[in-house]
Amino acid sequence: MQNFTVHQGVVATLDRANVDTDQIIPKQFLKRIERTGFGQFLFFDWRFLEDGETENPDFELNRINVKGASILLTRQNFGSGSSREHAVWALDDYGFRAVIAPSFADIFFNNCFKNGVLPIALSEEDVEELFQRAEKGNPYQLTVDLENQVITDGQGFERSFEVDASRRHNMLHGLDDIAQTLLHEDKITAFEEARG
């Protein structure tokens, strides 16, 4: 997992509440066994017209000023629905490093931390202000500083955010579940050898 300390990136807005994991990554694309390659299917039913190839010009992420965006700004209850980890894999593979919303579905929120995508919960008022600023920016950029737990835009917007200390540590050091286990490899090996 890639570590996350300070990230500056273009903001893409998704002005929709209750976006569920089936909208993030439709079920027909879940047959892959790799964790990569899902970005091409992110928001597939919204990003593409019925032919599945032509980009929908009305979809927010298809705007030219947000191409290459790495911060997603959206509304409440993002990531609801089924517990598929593929949703976070798709966001990560597409290039998103952080998602900002007033609230997240619990399982999706946990999956983000396990896969190196930083979910940031801000108040609805702060999210609304960011939407208004993003509409004026061309493109609009934010700096997300996980070390100091602050978001800034260099134009007067600055807000702090909270992240659990252990999750913050893991994100700062790029530690997923496997990497955390490997930190104790010597103890695991000693235990296994002692068991004979």
Swiss-Prot record:
UniProt keyword annotation of Transcription regulation present: no
InterPro entries on file: 3-IsopropMal_deHydase_ssu, Aconitase/3IPM_dehydase_swvl, AconitaseA/IPMdHydase_ssu_swvl, IPMI_Swivel, LeuD
GO MF annotations in UniProt: 3-isopropylmalate dehydratase activity
GO cellular component: 3-isopropylmalate dehydratase complex
Keywords, sorted A to Z: Amino-acid biosynthesis, Branched-chain amino acid biosynthesis, Leucine biosynthesis, Lyase
Biological process annotations from GO: L-leucine biosynthetic process
Coiled-coil residue windows: none
Signal peptide region: none
Pathway recorded for this protein: Amino-acid biosynthesis; L-leucine biosynthesis; L-leucine from 3-methyl-2-oxobutanoate: step 2/4
Protein EC: 4.2.1.33
Leading EC class: lyase
Catalytic activity: (2R,3S)-3-isopropylmalate = (2S)-2-isopropylmalate
Pfam family for this entry, one: Aconitase_C
Family: Belongs to the LeuD family. LeuD type 1 subfamily.
NCBIfam families: leuD (TIGR00171), PRK01641.1 (NF002458)
Subunit structure as annotated in this protein's UniProt entry: Heterodimer of LeuC and LeuD.
Physiological role: Catalyzes the isomerization between 2-isopropylmalate and 3-isopropylmalate, via the formation of 2-isopropylmaleate.
The name this protein goes by in its record: 3-isopropylmalate dehydratase small subunit
Organism: Rhodopirellula baltica (strain DSM 10527 / NCIMB 13988 / SH1)
Originating gene: leuD
